[in-house]
Every structure is written in C-alpha cells, then in structure tokens.
Amino acid sequence: MRVIGLMSGTSYDAIDAAAADLGLAGDRLVLKPLGLMSEAYDSGLREELAAALPPAATSLAGVCRLDTRIGQAFAAAAVRADRELCGGRAELVASHGQTVYHWAEAGRVYGTLQLGQPAWIAEATGLPVVADFRPRDIAAGGQGAPLVSLVDLLWLRGRAGTSVALNLGGIANLTAPDGTAFDTGPACALIDAAAHGLSGGRLDHDVDGALAARGTVHEPMLRRLLAEPYYALPAPKTTGKELFHLGYLRDALAGFGTLTAEDVIATLTRLTALTVADAVRAVRATEVVASGGGTRNPVLMEMLARELGAVALRTSDELGLPSAAKEAYAFAVLGFLTVHGLAGTDPVSTGARHPSVLGSVTPGRDGLRLPPRADWSPVRLVLE
C-alpha cells in the first residue's frame, strides 16, 4: 500500500511529506521509502499560527480559520507528494496535522488539539485520510505522545546493546527498547524562540548553530533553567510550547542584565544537550539514533556528543531512514496500521491502559474501502 505521511512539528515551519510503500510479510512490516519533500508554510499563515499559539489568546473564529487554512496547506502538500513521489498512485494519506495545544496538568493529559481539517486533504487528493491520531490514546489514559514510539520500537528491535531513538524537533523525545518513552524537554523550541525574539523577527532558528558557536554559556542562567520542575517528573511525561515558549524564556532572563543573543542561544543549546543526555543516561542507553531538525544543528550535536561520552550518537540517516522526515514516515506507518485494524500505541510508552487503534478516517472520493483486517501485529519494521 502506497501511503503518504504528513507532519508539521512544534517548530511549525513547514509540512513534511514522506511517501512509503508498506506491506505486511509474516511478523514484519516492510517499508520501502519512495521519497520525501517539504512544503514551507507561507509567511502569512505562519505568522497567523504563531500569533495564536500559547500563551497568546485566540478566538473560536481564529481556530476555525486556522483549521481550514492549515488543512488546505496540507492538502496541497499531499497532492504534490502523490504526483512527485507516488506517480499519482497513492492509496492513503496519514496526516498528523499541526499541534496547537496539549492540555496537561499535574502529569496527566486531558486533551490535545491538532489543526488541519482532513476533509480538505480527502477532497483534493480523492484519497481516504487518517488523522486526529492522538486523542484515542488520551481517552485510554495515555499521554497521547510520543506516538512515534511504537515505530521506533519496531524499527530498532534487535540492535545490539540498548539503542534509543531520539527526536530533536521543537520538543525532544526518546524511546527506549523496553518501551519507556517521554519528552525530555525542549530541543529547538527555546532556541527558535530566542532566535526569533532577539533578532526582531529576522530569524526563525539558529542557522547551522552559528549564533551558539559565537556565544558563551551563561552558567547562572543555565542553572535557573535546569531548575525547571518538568525535568524531575517520572516517565511517561509530555510537554510542549504551552510551557517552553518566549514568555518562559523572558522570565528565565529576568535579573541577568543584558545578555547577547549569542550567549543566550549558546546557553539554550547547552540546556538541550544536558537534559537530553540526562534522559539517555536514565535509560542506560549504549546508542542514540537521532532524527529531527535538531540534527541539522552541528553545535547542538557536538554538545550532545560531548555530554553522552561513550554512548554512540548517530543519525537515523545512517540506518536508512531520513532524519528530516522520520516523523512523517512514522505517521505513514501509523495510518497503515489503522486501516488494517492494528493498534498504533505501546501502553508502556504512553501510559495508556491498553493499546489503541488510532485516528479518525475521512473517506475518499470513492467512499471508504478499507483493506481486510490483519490477523496479527508486526513485531519488526524492516526498511528496503
């Protein structure tokens, strides 16, 4: 089955589309990558989205407009991916949408909201669309994240030692072989917020880690940041830009006088490296396989490698899965599992009471024709 996975992460800079030919073969799920592409949000939509994200206030009218506009942007990306990556022969779209809010209190998640109305995708492509993946796990008592953990478990199963998957997006999350999975804290969220806020909006992120490379870590600020209570919470746990946003950063800077943008970003980059390395040590990993936009920041990767010491650090590209679109591939897998009636969660990873078949399905132009329910769940993901 040719599936297009669509994903826009907490950095909300672009829509990643990854196409894969997926099939079950015995106890294996075989994934043949067909290609990937990225479609940047237009500046107006990105600004509208940024203005609506926590801690800012928004309106129901604003949410409705964003749901439609993001859905139309995802639809355009899906049409292009079908044409350029699948030769017009895609059979399913799996859309994560754009997370705008994750409702968590006292370690429990009560709700989550991803925008990007899937009806626009179904209308534009004519294909069935699986979307709204996270709420089913939350209803079962889980965190609704990290959902890529099941894919990580299937993919890294059988590797020597203790291999953990690490995603460095806006938020960092990891998955260990025993199913333990959680958000470690910010990966690029605070770095991006600082780059944007301290450059007067000229920059969206620290390009190639250039600002961090010119800066010096401000130890008092780092100590204040490391005192954040989230880091001490037990797994499973999840977080997002509801906590780690520009206002949070401004509070952290209070009382330190004027710091250069370079020093602030160097400090935030070190914060990510330290908190990720602490999480890796907590699960006694011997290897870290990293993916996500943060892998393109050489300063962050160098700091992280230094903190990890003897623990090997490599990117998912080295194992055959492009780090730039690993999450999009993961949601293609989750969509495939859903239409085959298979669970897309591991309760150990999310804290749910039981595994769940994820998402809601929007029929395509020819109605809803699902494949036969699979008789068993795969235990390994194999790349071809």
UniProtKB/Swiss-Prot annotation:
GO terms for molecular function: ATP binding; kinase activity; phosphotransferase activity, alcohol group as acceptor. It catalyses: 1,6-anhydro-N-acetyl-beta-muramate + ATP + H2O = N-acetyl-D-muramate 6-phosphate + ADP + H(+). Keywords: ATP-binding, Carbohydrate metabolism, Kinase, Nucleotide-binding, Transferase. It comes from the Bacteria. InterPro entries: Anhydro_N_Ac-Mur_kinase, ATPase_NBD. Pfam families: AnmK (PF03702). Its EC number is 2.7.1.170. It is an enzyme of class 2 (transferase). ATP binds at residues 9-16. Pathway: Amino-sugar metabolism; 1,6-anhydro-N-acetylmuramate degradation; Cell wall biogenesis; peptidoglycan recycling. GO terms for biological process: 1,6-anhydro-N-acetyl-beta-muramic acid catabolic process; amino sugar metabolic process; peptidoglycan turnover. Belongs to the anhydro-N-acetylmuramic acid kinase family. PANTHER family: ANHYDRO-N-ACETYLMURAMIC ACID KINASE. Catalyzes the specific phosphorylation of 1,6-anhydro-N-acetylmuramic acid (anhMurNAc) with the simultaneous cleavage of the 1,6-anhydro ring, generating MurNAc-6-P. Is required for the utilization of anhMurNAc either imported from the medium or derived from its own cell wall murein, and thus plays a role in cell wall recycling. This is Anhydro-N-acetylmuramic acid kinase. The lineage of its organism: Bacteria, Bacillati, Actinomycetota, Actinomycetes, Kitasatosporales.
